[in-house]
Amino acid sequence: MSTSTTRRVKLANLAPDFYKALIELDKVSDTGLDPKLAHLVRIRASQINGCAYCTDMHSLDLMEFGAEQQQRITLLPVWREAQKYYTEQEKAALQLTEAITLISVDHVPDDVYEIAAAAFDEKDLAQLIALIITINMWTRVGVTGKMEPGHYKP
């Protein structure tokens, strides 16, 4: 990991139209999905992409649903070994999140897609895919801009 102190451009200031469009996209990316599921998806993609800011932000958001969420957040990187803490829909969503986030590894395998398609109706599946794509954009903004955790307040 780089410890460079190179100043990074702030997209919010220098590409404001893009940044505003991303904010608007984010507002509709989880429409109709369970908020806890949506935050788990955001956290998992953020962990995979190494975005500390996004991981912190969405963990804090999920904690707003109660202290019992802490264990689910803690176990998220190893959710396959801790399946009893996640619903069937959440497990399907997490598996799809990992496939889409790591798309260069194996694209989105048919079996992963089929599990998600069985767990969600078509509209919610489309919304889930939109959410995963959106958080992946945000994590790239956060990592590229070296956004630091600890500044977000729910």
Where in the sequence are the language-model features?
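Hydrophobic alpha-helical segments
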Residues: 1-154
